[in-house]
Structures are given as C-alpha cells and as structure tokens.
C-alpha cells in the first residue's frame, strides 16, 4: 500500500557541507553538474494524502537546493549518466583534525556498507582530486522529498495507517542497524527522510558508532538531540546500548500521535523532570549507571507516581495497542526497554507491515496471480560493521590517504566516475547559496 503525494518535492533537512572552493574535474571524466538553483519551495502538506496504491509517484521538481543544516547545503542534482535526480551531500573540511577525520571516514564507510530499504546509503562518491588538493567529500544518495519533522508540523492529517507504516519502517531500519552493531545516537524526526509515497529512510550517521560491548569503556554523552535523549544519557551514564535509539523512537511515536514534542524542556535537568512526571520516580535499579548528582536530584525530590494514562489523550489514534507499545519503548530502565526486533512483533504494527509489503517495498513483487512476498520481512545485516581499523589511525595524513584510496577503490569496475563541474551555469548559484548559508551558520554557532 502506497501513500501517494502531489508529486512535487518538499525541502528536506539533510546534513552536508558548506562549499569552500571548486574542484576541477580531471581531463576526460564526466562532469557532475548541479543544474537548477531556484528558490526552495514551501513545504507542501499535500505530499501525504489518503492511503492508496498508486505505483511510484511523479518525478521531483527541477533541480535546486533541498536542505540546509549546520554543516551546509544539500542539492538535488541530475546524474548525467542516466538522467536520474539524486541528492548531493558535501562533507567539507574533513581533514582538520584526527577526531573529525575518523568520524567522517566512519560515516563514509557506513554509507557504503548499508544495504537496506529504510536506511539511506551512498549511491556513489564523487571522484576526489589529487590527494594534495583533497579537502572535501561529495556523496550521492537517493533523493527524498521531505523529512518526518516537516510532516508532523504540517496541517496534513495523519491517519492511523500513516502512523503505523512510518513506525514500522523506522523500527525495520533500526533493527538492521542494531544487527550490524551500530548505534545511530541521533534518531529524531529530522533524520527520518520521507518521499512522496511515504517510504522512509533513516539518515545522518555523523554521530553513529559501533556498540561498545566492554562496559568499562566510556562513551560520549554528547549524543542525541535533547528532546529525544534517553534518561540514562541524561543521568550521565558512561556506557549505553541500543536501547537509547528505542527511547528516541518512542518519543517520535508519541509525536506522531499527538503532533507535538512529548518531552520539550529547556535544559537536560528539566528534560529528566518531564520524564519522571510521566513515568514516575524510577526505582534504584533503573538508575544503576547514573552519576551521583543525577541520582541525588531524583531522590531528593518528591516521590512521583506514574501518569501513563495521559498517553491516551495524545489523540484519537492512541489506542490501547498503541499505548501499550509506546510504554514498552519509554521504560526508564534500558535493560527492560523493548528491542527493535520485539517491537516489530507487536500486534500494533501488523497492519503497518501488511501495508508496507503490499506495494511500498522493493523486497516483494506482484505477478499476474497475485503478490509474491519475501521470506524475511525485516532482514538483518549479513555481518557486523567492522570498525577495528580505527585503532590504527594515528595521523590526519594517514586517514586522508586511506579515505582517498577508499573512494577511488569504490569506482573500480563500476560506472564512469563523476566530478563537480565548476563551469556549470548553475554553479555560481550553488556557490552563492552555500556562501550565504556559511555566514549564517557562523553567527549561529557563536551564540
């Protein structure tokens, strides 16, 4: 079952980079030409209409910038090899220090590792220049029309069918990531891309990393946008597991039901207070990994009983099955929180699974006698993502050489490589849009 849209594109929030210079393509190679550059259109809530099967939908609008973020701009561009429109993401200034080098290399390898319909992956990487001039990376991904944040804040009605099929796809993609040993660590509506047929893909792996199995190894707490941050991170836990992503999905589930952020606080402490207002004062066993200050903050306050019944007031779509699944996701104790695999087996998502695999997915297909379904509706990764190479990375130049070789190797035996074409008529518009945004980002970061 597809969810058709108007066929027009909606700007989506994607992470990319601010262009700091031009890359001259090597002689004899094809140009990758951003062509377009019109103003970004306003969000079109009609992109989600009443659920029905209608095939693939219309093509996007002409090429243009489709998203701005703290790291720059993403453009819709045309691949000259086949005429298809795709998204072009830039990772700028990636070799400034060893930490950023490792992060970008990890994200790049992940984008090339992913093979799942609900996880954004790299379709191609633009050919890099000679290593001495190599400072930025351009990644081509599938073009998506909007993100879940824009869907939620739009006036477009969201039916129970929409909510179920969105949640099903989020958990389907998350099950795949977790099976590969990957924690996303920034699941939020803006990082869930949606096309005009309501197909959803998890994106933005800048904070993603392999799950650390050794509990003695500390992990950063500077992860996850605050509204979607799990209580164990808010309470200073130095080690966490995939349950942090499930908490984020629970917050998004509630947001889909109520069309507003579930825990919207001004500070991490207030965020924790809002969580305990809903879930009640947690037992000591649920705070086993909390820092002393956070534990003391909870214990010196008045005892709070749970008030989970208010979840039924989110909307008319908050049925008993919906609230039951939501409560399994929003458990204070991460060890008791439901997994993506078990959540997918919940009765609430049965209809979402059926609708998705009826005519939205690529793993099932129709024949004259009916629908042929895949043997595995929610596949896992064939192997864990290997990050063991990171231990041997000791210098910026070493990483730069490895990244350059990695990108070059991606093109071996494949289609002709592409490069940025600075002579394109639209390139000046591209540069102006990124230069303007660069100044805005700089001012924002100073505040």
Curated annotation (Swiss-Prot):
<keyword id="KW-0217">Developmental protein</keyword>
<dbReference type="GO" id="GO:0007179">
    <property type="term" value="P:transforming growth factor beta receptor signaling pathway"/>
</dbReference>
<dbReference type="GO" id="GO:0106310">
    <property type="term" value="F:protein serine kinase activity"/>
</dbReference>
<dbReference type="GO" id="GO:0000287">
    <property type="term" value="F:magnesium ion binding"/>
</dbReference>
<feature type="active site" description="Proton acceptor">
    <location>
        <position position="186"/>
    </location>
</feature>
<dbReference type="InterPro" id="IPR017441">
    <property type="entry name" value="Protein_kinase_ATP_BS"/>
</dbReference>
<dbReference type="InterPro" id="IPR050117">
    <property type="entry name" value="MAP_kinase"/>
</dbReference>
<dbReference type="GO" id="GO:0018107">
    <property type="term" value="P:peptidyl-threonine phosphorylation"/>
</dbReference>
<comment type="similarity">
    <text>Belongs to the protein kinase superfamily. CMGC Ser/Thr protein kinase family. MAP kinase subfamily.</text>
</comment>
<dbReference type="GO" id="GO:0031398">
    <property type="term" value="P:positive regulation of protein ubiquitination"/>
</dbReference>
<keyword id="KW-0539">Nucleus</keyword>
<dbReference type="GO" id="GO:1904894">
    <property type="term" value="P:positive regulation of receptor signaling pathway via STAT"/>
</dbReference>
<feature type="binding site">
    <location>
        <position position="89"/>
    </location>
    <ligand>
        <name>ATP</name>
    </ligand>
</feature>
<keyword id="KW-0808">Transferase</keyword>
<dbReference type="GO" id="GO:0005634">
    <property type="term" value="C:nucleus"/>
</dbReference>
<keyword id="KW-0547">Nucleotide-binding</keyword>
<comment type="subunit">
    <text>Interacts with sox11, hmgxb4/hmg2l1, rnf138/narf, stat3.1 and mef2a.</text>
</comment>
<protein>
    <recommendedName>
        <fullName>Serine/threonine-protein kinase NLK2</fullName>
        <ecNumber>2.7.11.24</ecNumber>
    </recommendedName>
</protein>
<keyword id="KW-0479">Metal-binding</keyword>
<dbReference type="GO" id="GO:0005524">
    <property type="term" value="F:ATP binding"/>
</dbReference>
<dbReference type="GO" id="GO:0009952">
    <property type="term" value="P:anterior/posterior pattern specification"/>
</dbReference>
<comment type="function">
    <text>Negatively regulates Wnt/beta-catenin-signaling during development. Plays a role together with sox11 in neural induction during early embryogenesis. Involved in TGFbeta-mediated mesoderm induction in early embryos, acting downstream of map3k7/tak1 to phosphorylate stat3.1. Augments the rnf138/narf-directed ubiquitination and degradation of tcf/lef by enhancing the association of rnf138/narf and tcf/lef. Phosphorylates mef2a to play a role in anterior neural development, including eye formation.</text>
</comment>
<keyword id="KW-0723">Serine/threonine-protein kinase</keyword>
<dbReference type="GO" id="GO:0005737">
    <property type="term" value="C:cytoplasm"/>
</dbReference>
<keyword id="KW-0879">Wnt signaling pathway</keyword>
<dbReference type="GO" id="GO:0035556">
    <property type="term" value="P:intracellular signal transduction"/>
</dbReference>
<feature type="domain" description="Protein kinase">
    <location>
        <begin position="60"/>
        <end position="349"/>
    </location>
</feature>
<dbReference type="InterPro" id="IPR000719">
    <property type="entry name" value="Prot_kinase_dom"/>
</dbReference>
<feature type="binding site">
    <location>
        <begin position="66"/>
        <end position="74"/>
    </location>
    <ligand>
        <name>ATP</name>
    </ligand>
</feature>
<dbReference type="GO" id="GO:0016055">
    <property type="term" value="P:Wnt signaling pathway"/>
</dbReference>
<dbReference type="GO" id="GO:0031625">
    <property type="term" value="F:ubiquitin protein ligase binding"/>
</dbReference>
<dbReference type="GO" id="GO:0140297">
    <property type="term" value="F:DNA-binding transcription factor binding"/>
</dbReference>
<dbReference type="Pfam" id="PF00069">
    <property type="entry name" value="Pkinase"/>
</dbReference>
<dbReference type="GO" id="GO:0004707">
    <property type="term" value="F:MAP kinase activity"/>
</dbReference>
<dbReference type="InterPro" id="IPR003527">
    <property type="entry name" value="MAP_kinase_CS"/>
</dbReference>
<keyword id="KW-0418">Kinase</keyword>
<keyword id="KW-0597">Phosphoprotein</keyword>
<dbReference type="GO" id="GO:0007399">
    <property type="term" value="P:nervous system development"/>
</dbReference>
<keyword id="KW-0460">Magnesium</keyword>
<dbReference type="GO" id="GO:0018105">
    <property type="term" value="P:peptidyl-serine phosphorylation"/>
</dbReference>
<dbReference type="GO" id="GO:0004674">
    <property type="term" value="F:protein serine/threonine kinase activity"/>
</dbReference>
<keyword id="KW-0805">Transcription regulation</keyword>
């Amino acid at each position: 079952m597809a969810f058709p849209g108007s066929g027009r594109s909606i700007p989506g929030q994607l992470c990319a980079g601010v262009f700091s210079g031009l890359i001259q393509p090597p002689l004899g190679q094809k140009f990758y030409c951003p062509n377009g550059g019109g103003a970004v259109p306003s969000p079109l809530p009609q992109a989600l209409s009443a659920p029905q099967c209608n095939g693939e939908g219309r093509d996007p609008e002409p090429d243009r910038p489709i998203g701005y973020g703290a790291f720059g701009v993403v453009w819709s561009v045309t691949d000259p090899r086949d005429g298809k429109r795709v998204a072009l993401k830039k990772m700028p200034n990636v070799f400034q220090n060893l930490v950023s080098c490792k992060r970008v290399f990890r994200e790049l390898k992940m984008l090339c590792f992913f093979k799942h319909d609900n996880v954004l992956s790299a379709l191609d990487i633009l050919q890099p220049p000679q290593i001495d001039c190599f400072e930025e990376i351009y990644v081509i991904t599938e073009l998506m029309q909007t993100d879940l944040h824009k869907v939620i804040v739009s006036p477009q009605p969201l039916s129970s069918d929409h909510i179920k099929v969105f949640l099903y796809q989020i958990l389907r993609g998350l099950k795949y990531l977790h099976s590969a040993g990957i924690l996303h660590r920034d699941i939020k509506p803006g990082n869930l891309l949606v096309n005009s047929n309501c197909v959803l893909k998890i994106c933005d792996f800048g904070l993603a990393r392999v799950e650390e199995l050794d509990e003695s190894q500390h992990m950063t707490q500077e992860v996850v946008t605050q509204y979607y941050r799990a209580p164990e991170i808010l309470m200073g836990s130095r080690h966490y597991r995939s349950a942090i992503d499930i908490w984020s999905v629970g917050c998004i589930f509630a947001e889909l039901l109520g069309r507003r952020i579930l825990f919207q606080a001004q500070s991490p402490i207030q965020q924790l207070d809002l969580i305990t207002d809903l879930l009640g004062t947690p037992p000591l066993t649920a705070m086993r990994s909390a820092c002393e200050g956070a534990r003391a903050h909870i214990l010196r306050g008045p005892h709070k009983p749970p008030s989970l019944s208010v979840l039924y007031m989110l909307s008319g779509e908050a049925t008993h099955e919906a609230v039951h699944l939501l409560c399994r996701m929003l458990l204070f104790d991460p060890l008791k929180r439901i997994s993506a695999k078990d959540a997918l087996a919940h009765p609430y998502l049965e209809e979402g699974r059926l609708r998705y695999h009826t005519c939205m997915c690529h793993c099932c297909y129709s024949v004259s006698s009916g629908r042929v379904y895949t043997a595995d509706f929610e596949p896992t990764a064939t192997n864990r993502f290997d990050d063991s190479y990171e231990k041997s990375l000791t210098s910026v130049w070493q990483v730069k050489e490895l990244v350059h070789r990695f990108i070059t190797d991606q093109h071996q035996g494949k289609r002709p490589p592409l490069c940025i074409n600075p002579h394109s008529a639209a390139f000046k518009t591209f540069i102006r849009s990124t230069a303007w945004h660069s100044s805005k980002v700089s001012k924002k970061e100073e505040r």
